[in-house]
């Protein structure tokens, strides 16, 4: 076989056949073998076999993949589209080639086609199915992908994720901004966006469209009670709490915040409301019961402080008879009968507000504990309550 291949190479190069070169009688056997190779039918078969072996060797070594004429012909041939999702070609491409896929963002020229070395059109397995689904869902009327608005996410800094849309005419559109609750609260997120708005718009080539970009909203929580806006908690020792904050009680009675460090402060709650005197000792925030003709809205205080409702059941207790005299420290004028229930709020420490109810007979009940969202996270609030539960019961009940 090797003699035949060498014979075919010499014949192809224009050299005289081995039959003419071997004139000696000692080389008779070699001459007979060369004479057999020199027949036209055998010569064509050898050439075809040699070409097939070379073709197989080149395909196995991957030389066709880096051949420029082959790459140009494969990208420009009409059969390239049919080979796009062919299972053989998808299997033939190695896994490393798939990572050379260049993400073509819109705005890079819809008519320009990247070279094969820059991107590959072959995907294998689940990636091919995902691409087909994206084509069916997001393709335009003419079926091209270059005009689609593609969505992508950038992490500007830890805890800040911005979702962009790549526009067909170039540039990006701002779709969504997300902040991590572990790093940002609402005010920190708004302040960050106000300071970095121009940088983000310039860095990511965001098209403004002559519109004012709104401030980002606070990331939503799964708990519906935490979706309300949360204003900053005002200091109780320097500012007067708004008298429009009320909470509805049973029997049509409501309670309102009293002014700290005041003796006999009188205010009007609006049309149909009765006037009420709040007599509070220094350092105490008091509630006074009052009859109202109309019930105020609860949304004004629904987000003032985070309320840990899971603690309510464990916090209810009654005081001992020795502590009955402590309830007389608060002198609250009641508009109805003298045996009505009373509620007031104590600030145990900055950001911790304890609501206490005085029941008929001098019994006190711990209604709830509220924590300021600016000072306590949910986990921090639970840990604080576990550590201070006994002290709160001893101190206030």
Swiss-Prot record:
Entry GO terms, CC: nucleus
Subcellular location: Nucleus
Compositionally biased spans, kind Basic and acidic residues: 220-230
Comp. bias (Acidic residues): 124-148
Coiled-coil spans in chain: none
Biased composition (Low complexity): 309-320
Primary site of residence: nucleus
Disulfide bonds: none
Start and end residues of each BRX domain: 150-205, 342-397
Sequence segments annotated as region (Disordered): 14-37, 105-148, 212-278, 300-342
Record key words, sorted: Nucleus, Repeat
Family, similarity comment: Belongs to the BRX family.
PANTHER family (UniProt xref): PROTEIN BREVIS RADIX-LIKE 1, PROTEIN BREVIS RADIX-LIKE 3
UniProt name for this protein: Protein Brevis radix-like 1
Species this chain originates from: Oryza sativa subsp. japonica (Rice)
